[in-house]
């Protein structure tokens, strides 16, 4: 009898958590700039690209983060693993210092995802990003999904799976 009650309470707590995080993601949802695919970006290696120039047959994970962000310390390793597995990842280092500072941080943490430095937060402002980390999943040039705050490798992997096969 106790196990049944424990399972019922656990399920109730889990569903409440899912509802609350979904509401928070909806409220924190960024606004996609109209010219999303035309925006030219430059990564820390000096490569210039646009979101449109990325493979449109694969979902793109756009990851807004900061070196100062506590939750990002837990999310960035998951993002790095996904990038190593071949997923398209473009990260935006938000207000994290100059390029040398960001490169140093990436190197110290052994992160190898494509990174654009946004030292003044101008790019993030165009998206109305108010929370880090914010992860925007782009599919065929459109925003497919958004998640904010702490998220896991498996949570992202499931989202990417759905974007690849149903997006």
Swiss-Prot record:
It is found in: Cell membrane. Residues 30-167 form the Thioredoxin domain. The chain crosses the membrane at residues 10-27. GO terms for molecular function: antioxidant activity; disulfide oxidoreductase activity. Keywords: Cell membrane, Disulfide bond, Membrane, Redox-active center, Transmembrane, Transmembrane helix. Gene3D superfamilies: Glutaredoxin. InterPro entries: AhpC/TSA, Thioredoxin-like_sf, Thioredoxin_CS, Thioredoxin_domain, Thioredoxin_ResA/DsbE_sf. One of its GO terms (cellular component) is plasma membrane. Disulfide bonds join 69-72. This is Thioredoxin-like protein HI_1115.
